[in-house]
Amino acid sequence: MKKESFGIILPITLLAYFLILMDNSIIFTSSVQIGESLNLTDTSLAWVSNAYTLTFGGFLLLSGRLSDLLGRKRIFQIGLAIFGLSSLVIGLAQNASMMILARAIQGIGSSIIAPTTLALMMDTYTGEMRIKAISYYGATAGIGSSVGLLIGGGLTSFVSWRVGFLINVPLTLLLMYLTHRHVVAKAGHQEKIDYLGSLLSVAG
């Protein structure tokens, strides 16, 4: 009996999810160095995290809904592009405004990636394979946070906190390429977007 293989979809989704978890851990371990290098006040430094948290939470439901309506592949690639570009800006940030704005945009990218990775797995795998894929997804949550602390501390001590974000750029480009090549585009549901509900979910 031939053993089933997860193929390329599982590595794509897990790596994408890992990146957003790792970056949050890097922010946690590198906050002092970020504040010093950009001359941030305590309030500005707090907003480096808060801006991300607000946009991530605010856009999470809308992002999941858009992936249902417009198709997982398209929305996932948009999320990767937003995440990669904002990571580039964060890595090159020279002041508080640039850093906070880029973190807010990165939160939007992460809010797209997080639900879409899980949805892609649910669409791709069934039965026992789906159960295993979800267990790997859950394990990635813990591993991503823990490894992020190690990577963030190491990069901050020996190189620069900026590298932790700049490394996202080639990785998101790789993920976009793999998604383009291997993820099958499926039509979304033919329903109208509830603009009022979407606006309220973002504002809430």
Locations of the language-model features?
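Membrane-interface helix termini in secondary transporters
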Residues: 33-35, 64-65, 69, 154
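Extracytoplasmic
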Residues: 8-53, 113
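Cytoplasmic helix-loop-helix junction between adjacent transmembrane helices
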Residues: 104-139
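Conserved MFS/SLC helix-loop-helix module at the cytosolic interface between two early adjacent transmembrane helices
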Residues: 58-97
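MFS-fold secondary transporters
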Residues: 36, 86-91, 106, 179
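Helix-breaking motifs and short loop linkers at transmembrane-helix boundaries and internal kinks
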Residues: 39, 71, 92-98, 126, ...
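Central cavity-lining transmembrane alpha-helices of secondary-active solute carriers
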Residues: 50-64, 114-118
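Hydrophobic transmembrane-helix bundles of small-molecule transporters
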Residues: 157-204
